[in-house]
Amino acid sequence: MRGGTDPRFRVRPTLEVLELIHQCKILPLDDVLALQDAYIFLRRLEHRIQVWDDQQTHYLPDDQEVRARLAQSMFGENAEVQTFLEELDRHQNKVAQLFGQAFQLDGESRLDLTPLAHDWKPDATHFPESLVRWQAWLGGSKQKQLPEKSRLIFDNLMRQAAERLEADGTPQLSADQALLRFFDLLEAIARRSAYLSILAEYPKALANVLELLKASQWGAQYLTRHPHLLDHLLNSRTEKTLIERPQEYWLEVKASLNMRLDDVMADGDGSEQAMDILRVTHHTETFITLLADLGIGVDSPLPLEKVSDHLSALADLILQTTFERVWPGIAQKFEFSKDLTPPFAIISYGKLGGKELGYASDLDLVFLYESDENDYAAQEIYALLAKRMINWLTAFTSTGSLFEIDTRLR
């Protein structure tokens, strides 16, 4: 799941991936160690089974004599079969337990994918506008172009969303608006089966999506534009460090971001991939802040000033990182040492300058440099640096853009 946006996870060795999971604090250390132990045990057992049968098999033999020899091979000549089987069960059960916990299924059933009743439709009293939208969807070209399974998921997600919104006491107007927003989201992801599957297979994700859609039109539009963020609704618990120790949190985000940027920029320019990584990081952290703002995954919603603090800290991080990644290219062009710290400053005005940034705020920036009176190349150098930074921050890539930048002094 994370390999789609984080290139560090696109490696084959399982133990290397588990170490990355530990470094990124995706799982607690005890769980990572348990998975490492299980992997080593199961891999050793796999090798012994395959050597015994001389074929690529992963089935434990039923023959008790073979099992006894496997136990001795794993634990020594005095090992008992029962001890071997108990150890095997322990590792298998632990892996299954951690896998189940990873998605917080909480015993809820997955989406029913049976065809809807022919006459099913959103209740006209509760969802008048959604009903009109649904009737226009039925038999339309977009619906007909979907694969059968995707169409079944789409239809049943609409049915379940309508039932949940009607049953949870959401006021009629808010419920209708939320269902319309859900329709927008489903249309945006309808041809991307992985995203549909998240909502179909993990009821907690669907519940969190509906909470978001009810609470925020901007959040609904943001998720629809960036559906990869659905991953963050599988488990709604917001990282506590963000709220309790924000400075530590942003240092961790910066370290993770730099590792990813190093991977794509180590062997060449890699600026296009780097720009995408910056955008995905910004989308992710903005969305995590939004969830905390709305009270999704936290004990109580973030106060408004804390939301502004987080968004401003994120913008500062993106600006600093952009400068750090653009400057080496400028230094190389003008034959400076890339380790030279240039006499260059980014001054923030407006919302960011006052640490009052909102979700859709633009950035009011002024770029300043210092040079000797006779340094005639300085203007060219630092104008190019500012121009490239603005391009990194404002250009539209496959993952969108970062900010609108205003450099006019008023």
Name each region found by the language model:
Residues 1-410:
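Non-catalytic regulatory/linker segments of enzymes
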